[in-house]
Swiss-Prot record:
First-tier enzyme category under EC: oxidoreductase
Alphabetically ordered keywords of this record: FAD, Flavoprotein, Membrane, Oxidoreductase, Transmembrane, Transmembrane helix
Entry protein name: Squalene epoxidase 5
Matches recorded under Gene3D superfamilies: FAD/NAD(P)-binding domain
Membrane topology summary: Multi-pass membrane protein
Catalytic activity, EC: 1.14.14.17
Catalysed reactions, semicolon-separated: squalene + reduced [NADPH--hemoprotein reductase] + O2 = (S)-2,3-epoxysqualene + oxidized [NADPH--hemoprotein reductase] + H2O + H(+)
Essential cofactor(s): FAD
GO biological process, one term: sterol biosynthetic process
Amino acid sequence: MAFTNVCLWTLLAFMLTWTVFYVTNRGKKATQLADAVVEEREDGATDVIIVGAGVGGSALAYALAKDGRRVHVIERDLREPERIMGEFMQPGGRLMLSKLGLEDCLEGIDAQKATGMTVYKDGKEAVASFPVDNNNFPFDPSARSFHNGRFVQRLRQKASSLPNVRLEEGTVKSLIEEKGVIKGVTYKNSAGEETTALAPLTVVCDGCYSNLRRSLNDNNAEVLSYQVGFISKNCQLEEPEKLKLIMSKPSFTMLYQISSTDVRCVFEVLPNNIPSISNGEMATFVKNTIAPQVPLKLRKIFLKGIDEGEHIKAMPTKKMTATLSEKKGVILLGDAFNMRHPAIASGMMVLLSDILILRRLLQPLSNLGNAQKISQVIKSFYDIRKPMSATVNTLGNAFSQVLVASTDEAKEAMRQGCYDYLSSGGFRTSGMMALLGGMNPRPISLIYHLCAITLSSIGHLLSPFPSPLRIWHSLRLFGLAMKMLVPHLKAEGVSQMLFPVNAAAYSKSYMAATAL
């Protein structure tokens, strides 16, 4: 019995000694870590690493640097990019840009003013303009179209002009991770040397082809179609302030002025039948299939780029629901985080909105090294962004589906109903254009207009009298509309889509006239 007591007391003494040692040692480590953070601040260490210096990376670098953060931006290629997307800034995007102090980046690049669009279908045309009497939108209700590369270079120049921004050309190979926390990146610099960069916060903003996303979550992008584009040079559209949307086959065609002398021509092809660009099949397809559907007054300009041998580029259109990473110390942004069909040209607008939100949430934090607080910021960011992102994601993906031509009577009725709705004028046109332009980021308003288009299309389908076949097609049309909407209700969240309180809070914080 005595031996047993001795063993128990010995074990208890050992446990107490170990506990005291553990707590003391842990306290020392915490103190050392805090001292290291202070030392890093004193030594001019980086606060934030941004992977990618496109629109998002450059804008975020500028915003965070203006708040006193020391930012290291690593971009694979600092030459002026050539893209066929990211060339149209909606009114809502311009508002976000101005709130970030970057509106002047649209100056000096020959950007063109756009006040709406002209829609063409089956020989008819209708003008749909951004509403000028929207009292809830505190900014000039016009868009801008431009060469994407020129805009990106202006953003890079503006960001790198700040002394606490380091813009470096390099290829990021991987993220540095310790116990579920991202500490920085490993990258190859312009000299070909592999090196590391460390910071308490890493932002991955490297676009739709992100090679870092798969190490943060298992989110995969779905390819929807391909957008094919080229430039017709030394010409100007009739009414250049209106984007031209042609409801052609197999899908839509667009023309818009991206400089005083250049017109972007772009059309969509479905993924199961893409003509080859390299062997000339695509140019033949443009001349024989797409061009005859372009209105005569636009056709000469449309064909000019092909006839002059301008380079044709094709880009996949993708969609991907936003998903948070479980790893700490890292944030995904832009197309690396969330994608939708680019039919409504609103990707940059969502991205700039995200940057505004993230900047505001980070401003109260004096030290970004607290991974727990950063995780809370990211969760809040994910919820706050929903009114804008859910509206744009749902509208972009739904609108692109409606624009695809079909021999199916129900689908074609929906397509015709969309054209009729946009061309009807009044609150229908102004309401839809406010949504398209990011002037009214309210999911419930979008649902209202989608339901109105559906009911209008059903009414058109049932006239002049509801035969059994027409009733059947109407039911199918309603089913198609639900297939467009329900997946987004699930993906974005029913409460975020249906309850207006979140949208009201977003509008008050991020759509007001006052700067952030």
